[in-house]
């Protein structure tokens, strides 16, 4: 109960309170957080990440005292945006089938978001570049969703804005989220569906792995990303993520310790080799899906 901790500090004459989180909800280090106090306090209260709290403690231990400068701001009525680019086939009628390549471009407070999810957004941009001159009879949509971290708001809004006719046009969604970590225990590139069932997208990913002689590509069950709203309305979709799974029932898995923390930066948490592998697997899966006849893809989706 943070309220009690803050009240105790106030009673002892504290001018401010720095709380810090030891561990996150997924085995990661504690992240910067909102203390969400239910009682109004007369002093400033901040929620620090584990790394920030430790650094502050070390500074105090060395010097006995230190000066910490913090800025607080209140924001309301914020707007989130989805960034959407479409590559239409020549002589488009507007009714062609479509393949979606997606990611989210937001991070959480206090985290640079190199792997979560600049890696996914970078992948979408690179595949947009790679496919710019590829002729197909299908539309390709490259989408960067906003506000994934606050509850899949961007993708949920997008899916809810589609008519049933528009939903039926989408053959599959390749959603990249955390595709470049260097964490050794996150040893496989998974194509995840919310219910664990295979679909057109996971089939394409596994086939791509075979074509590339890559045995690190596996299928699994996981939600918590922008593939979920699509799956909920029957559109084949999968999350691509580096993860290690020890057990599915109960679910015991590994993602990087620096997930959602200040250490999720390019220097500490990015593997160019894994990024390249994700690009190759997802790019090959997308290409193969685009090359299939509409009849083939509809049969796989059924």
Predicted regions and their residues:
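His/Asp/Glu-rich mid-to-C-terminal helical/loop segments that flank catalytic regions of hydrolases
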Residues: 249-302
């Amino acid at each position: 109960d943070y309220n009690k901790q803050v009240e105790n500090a106030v009673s002892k004459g504290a001018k401010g309170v720095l709380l810090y989180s030891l561990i996150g909800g997924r085995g990661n280090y504690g992240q910067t957080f909102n203390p969400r106090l239910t009682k109004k306090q007369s002093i400033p209260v901040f929620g620090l990440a584990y790394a920030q709290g430790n650094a502050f403690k070390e500074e105090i231990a060395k010097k006995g005292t230190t000066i910490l400068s913090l800025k607080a701001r209140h924001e309301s009525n914020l707007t989130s945006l989805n960034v959407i680019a479409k590559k239409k086939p020549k002589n488009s009628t507007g009714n062609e089938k479509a393949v979606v390549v997606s990611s989210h471009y937001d991070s959480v407070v206090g985290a640079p978001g190199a792997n979560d999810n600049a890696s996914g957004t970078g992948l979408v941009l690179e595949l947009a570049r790679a496919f710019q001159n590829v002729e197909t009879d299908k539309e390709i949509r490259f989408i960067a969703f906003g506000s994934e971290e606050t509850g899949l708001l961007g993708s949920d809004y997008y899916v809810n804005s589609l008519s049933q006719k528009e939903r039926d046009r989408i053959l599959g969604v390749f959603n990249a989220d955390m595709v470049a970590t260097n964490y050794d225990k996150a040893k496989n590139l998974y194509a995840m569906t919310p219910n664990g069932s295979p679909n057109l997208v996971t089939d394409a990913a596994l086939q791509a792995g075979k074509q590339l002689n890559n045995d690190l590509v596996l299928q699994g069950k996981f939600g918590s990303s922008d593939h979920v709203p699509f799956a909920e309305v029957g559109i084949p979709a999968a999350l691509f993520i580096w993860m290690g799974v020890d057990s599915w029932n109960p679910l015991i898995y590994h993602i990087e310790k620096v997930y959602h923390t200040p250490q999720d930066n390019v220097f500490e948490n990015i593997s160019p080799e894994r990024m390249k592998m994700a690009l190759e697997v997802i790019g090959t899966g997308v290409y193969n899906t685009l090359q299939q006849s509409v009849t083939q893809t509809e049969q796989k989706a059924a």
